[in-house]
Amino acid sequence: IASQVMPLWQIGANGHTASKGVDILNYIANEDEKTSPLLQEEATAAGVHPFGYNIGDYNVVVCRSEASTMEDLKGRAFGIPAQGAAVYEAMGLNVVTCETADAYESLSRGVVDCFAAGISSVSSMKLYETAKSCLVLSATGGTGICMMNEASWEKLSEEQQKIFTEAYNETISWMKDRYDNELLPAYEKEI
């Protein structure tokens, strides 16, 4: 996670888009001379055929009081689900394990001072109602990888493999366009 944060209204500013994050991850996984072979080796050992990464959600930090940098978050009770805690602890934050379903109440009651969630959760759960500030980290979160069982992949003909690969590429292209050009502007208006 990048240490740079930006105000919520600058969601698409300075090249911070969901598609850019996915492009970087796919480069690391599929093209970079140092990392790609290691990741491919790991996938083979796990018995999976990776297609690539799919769009994730922006990580938004919702705070009960003003915050404009990651430094501003230090010393505050920082709510995050358990699976993301180690990343924020490594950044020197005072992590309080809190599931997303409990975020609104935890923020409202002061159990946590800040909470990190995907922008879709911040929007749908109206976490911004509890906040004096919302920061969007300059990285996406919740990004997953699209993969298939390697044995099943090997059973497919070359033509079938090509169809799966093209379908993945078309889907990611559609997702990136929809996320960057439809969903983010809609969230900006709501939040």
What do these predicted regions represent?
Residues 1-24, 41-191:
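N-terminal secretory/targeting leader peptides
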Residues 26-39:
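Signature of the catalytic double-stranded beta-helix
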